[in-house]
Amino acid sequence: TLLCTKLFFNEVNAVDKYEYKSKTERMLELMESGAYSRAAAIADEIDWRRVRNAVMLSNVSEIYEKTGEYQKGYDILTLAYQRAEGSRKIISRLCGLALKTGNVDEAIDFYDEFMQIAPKDPNQYILRYKILRAQRAPIEQQIEALEEYKKSEYIEEWAYELAKLYQEAGMTSECLEECDDLILWFSEGQYVYKAMELKMQYKPLTPSQQEKYDKRYARTSEETEEIPDIFSYAEADESEQEEEENGLPGAELMAA
């Protein structure tokens, strides 16, 4: 009887693993193609508490975040956090999702933890800015956070955000200077065109800027964004996951 019971559970586990593999492969395919709602529908069918792979859990959390299901995304990412304690990537995302679910105090806790783990990581300033924004802190403090980030990293999204903050604060000359810097450094792309439109609220574009702006639709229609290889990412070498995410070794699907 004991042998029969063991064989039965082995068969059940084999079916579970097959269904899990089949569903997650399809889910990641849909995620890769941008069909997040359909990917989320598959994710709803899986008991993620039994999954130990922190990378897979992070992907699922991102799917829910893309569909606006922030609480689900937060809950799944909390599981990833438990599987990979000390991961700055997961802690950073948890901070952002905590804000999206209205939990500012939790976001501050994750920010403090991020600072302990990675005190020199410039992304601390982005987290700080998001928290200050959620708290409706004085605009000067928000500007200071993004100015500090700019000293270490210059990313289109946050450069444009800084330009908008300058506009909000009535700092028109700083706003225009930031727009010109963004346009000069990155030349094209959605944030460059947004910066051009922001600048045009106050003064005309230069001839070269205007030429780029006039050709923006033709250029963007020709561009094809490279899609990340989610499958390779999800099947990352275990040792690399241990190093970067402090993931747990062993089978991805936990025993029931």
Where do the language-model regions lie?
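Intrinsically disordered, low-complexity acidic segments enriched in Asp/Glu and Pro
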Residues: 210-256
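Start-of-helix register in tetratricopeptide repeats
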Residues: 21, 54-55, 89, 123, ...
